[in-house]
Amino acid sequence: KTQADSFSWDGKAWHVKCSKMIEKGGNLIPSEDIITYVAEHVVTATGNHVQNTANLLNTKIAAIPVEHQYIVTEEDPKLIEYRQNNDEHPVLRDADAKWYVREERGGWILGPYEKNAPARFEYKVPENFRADLFPLDLDRIEQEYLSFIKRIPSTETLGIKDDFNGPICYTPDGN
């Protein structure tokens, strides 16, 4: 495991200086062991911090954090019955209705792919932002929720156990 500390472009290749990570007290921290990678292409996986990464690279990246709401249902007796003879239920994606659903502790997680979800952190994630959540706006995902109930009828009478609204990184067109 490594952490990228700095990078530079010499006109032909990237030079990426990294620290090897070590575990200390249950956390990964950088060690004194430094490695430099030389590469023609660098792929970043910085998610919501993509604009911070773009600034470091002195470039623009067409991705931005947007609000992503999802709900967790109470246990579904039909799903629990299914699990008595089967492995975990496969993830379902309804491309037309724009949502995914997966098993979660005997219930379901419904995550809509919202068109025009509000953008967050257009230029940089605030330094003090960790895993904070945004205010819910469940009206925005009502149609996806109704479609989910139609697709999986056993969910119609289930209560909502949890709901979340946090950032997820997408391209500006929401795809």
What does each model-found stretch correspond to?
Residues T2-H15, S19-I22:
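A conserved short coil-to-beta-strand element within the FAD-binding core of flavoproteins
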Residues D5, W14, V50-Q51, Q69, ...:
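Glycine-centered loop/turn positions within well-structured domains
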Residues G11-H15, I34, G107:
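A generic structural signal for beta-strand entry/edge sites
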Residues C18, N55, V72-E75, R102:
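Short beta-strand-to-turn element immediately C-terminal to the catalytic PLP-Schiff-base lysine
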Residues K24-H41:
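Core beta-strand elements of the Rossmann-like FAD/NAD(P) dinucleotide-binding domain
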Residues Y37-H49, T53:
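Short hydrophobic core segments
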Residues N52-Y70:
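Glycine-rich beta-alpha-beta "Rossmann" dinucleotide-binding loop(s) and their flanking helix/strand
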Residues T59, D76-N175:
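Active-site lid/adjacent beta-loop-alpha segment flanking the redox-cofactor pocket in flavoenzymes
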